Amino acid sequence: MKTGNQFNTVALVGRSNTPGIAEPLATLAGCIAKLGFDVVFEADTAREIGISGYPALTPAEIGARADVAVVLGGDGTMLGIGRQLAPYKTPLIGINHGRLGFITDIAAADMQALVPVILSGKFEREERSLLEARIVRNGEPIYHALAFNDVVVNRSGFSGMVELRASVDGRYMYNQRSDGLIVATPTGSTAYALSSAGPILHPQLQGVVLVPIAPHALSNRPIVLPDDSKIAIQIVAGRDVNVNFDMQSFTALELNDTIEVRRSKHTVPFLHPIGYSYYATLRKKLHWNEHASNEDDKAS
């Protein structure tokens, strides 16, 4: 049950098909339950780790019943559950049990110390934006999806370049020949967009970035757009073209299909430990200051 801003029910979500994750999840569940919170598990997580004694709920049921979700996994786990819980405004606490951990900012070794503090009400809250996209074919929408990181239109690994026609707010911008085009949120600017030479956007920046993938013309550069922009990308030429959403779901495209992308009305609340710094995350994950003095240790 949800009661104002107080946390009563805590949902636990784990990374799928991950050896060794059952023990830390069970430990965390016991720790949280001892503090007097009701603990529930995401159903797939409960089934995979074989835990009993806690209710097992679908993401929709978690959204309706839980006050906060604690996610133990990598960024992909956080992206997946974040999209599903976004309509319910369920806050997320991310514990890194993956490789990179840009958005799962609590180390697994620190979870028993930090999660209870956050659940007691001591945290820094941050809202992250989402994209919503639909595919239009012959004037009719055929597919709809949310994206936390990015919407990516690209060729398959065995086809040549594609030609895409991009417009913003109904105004023609360009035709582009490339391997594809990324539409990324600020959160997604440190994902695929970054590897394609896109800029890093601070998560609180109100913007969306378009990043070409291996463009034929070097003058096709990334561009940051206002976050209320309505972006349309039409398939002009090419074969075996796909669109994917956070690299977790995709659909095949045909010539003249249009992908319409805009900011979603939903946001995803993140709860960070007190003292959280996005810049510290960048330093650590991108290996900035590796040859600096102890200045990095002093920074916060």
From Swiss-Prot:
It holds the Pfam family NAD_kinase_C. Its EC number is 2.7.1.23. The active site is at D75 (proton acceptor). One of its GO terms (molecular function) is metal ion binding. NAD(+) binds at D75, G76, N149, D150, R177, D179, T190, A191, Y192, A193, L194, S195, A214, Q248. Keywords: ATP-binding, Cytoplasm, Kinase, NAD, NADP, Nucleotide-binding, Transferase. One of its GO terms (cellular component) is cytoplasm. Its cofactor is a divalent metal cation. It is found in: Cytoplasm. It catalyses: NAD(+) + ATP = ADP + NADP(+) + H(+). Its main location: cytoplasm. One of its GO terms (biological process) is NAD metabolic process. Transmembrane segments: none annotated. Belongs to the NAD kinase family. Involved in the regulation of the intracellular balance of NAD and NADP, and is a key enzyme in the biosynthesis of NADP. Catalyzes specifically the phosphorylation on 2'-hydroxyl of the adenosine moiety of NAD to yield NADP. This is NAD kinase. It comes from Burkholderia vietnamiensis (strain G4 / LMG 22486). The lineage of its organism: Bacteria, Pseudomonadati, Pseudomonadota, Betaproteobacteria, Burkholderiales. The gene is nadK.
